[in-house]
């Protein structure tokens, strides 16, 4: 019996992904100046507002507003349209006591090995497993979805498609045969934020020609493949202006089960 598997990917301008990118950039900035930095940074983005909250323990004090503005500019949003609120404070001393040194050191057990000197928190992110379907060692639907959003971002930043805006999402459904091998593309959904001036039929043609076709060369659509471009209709309002974003809500985009 054949089975169908669907994977999703979003562009860096998607509000949830924007928040992840800001949090990652704060962490990168701290680590580049202090390799022992500990950063627990959450971000929320909504209409005209970016809120950065959390705990940072580091010898370096990052300029959160500068980092946020840099990310917004890189993604394609106008930083001047956002107020930035920073609610960053030091890590709780009780929590810090558990990670400043290891349990072995606190119990006077031999902790001379570097691997036994650093304490561990109680949080983790569970990710998927490697597989042999693609050179990337990821399932084919995941690879195709990421190829679509990557091509969409390139088309935006290069100006290959005039009128694109930063927000976007792709979903790809691949049909697998009875032996568990992917063999055909069942459905492609591509949502791309755009300016109101670009006609829908022109946008569909451009996206098909410059995004979908090159991104899906690995497994091209057949005559029965369903290709849905902006199936909800107009996608003029997007990003934080239309939908509140939050860190951690797109973990399944970066991993899989």
Language-model regions: role of each:
Residues 1-40, 45:
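N-terminal, positively charged regions that mediate nucleic acid binding
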Residues 6, 10, 48, 66, ...:
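Glycine-rich, mobile lid/loop segments that gate access to catalytic sites or pores
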Residues 40-58:
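Short, charge-patterned binding micro-sites
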Residues 55-62, 234-251:
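Short glycine/threonine-rich loop-to-helix capping motif typified by GTGT followed
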Residues 58-72:
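Active-site-surrounding "flap" and adjacent substrate/cofactor-binding loops of secreted or lumenal enzymes
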Residues 255-257:
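Short, small-residue-rich loop/turn micro-motifs
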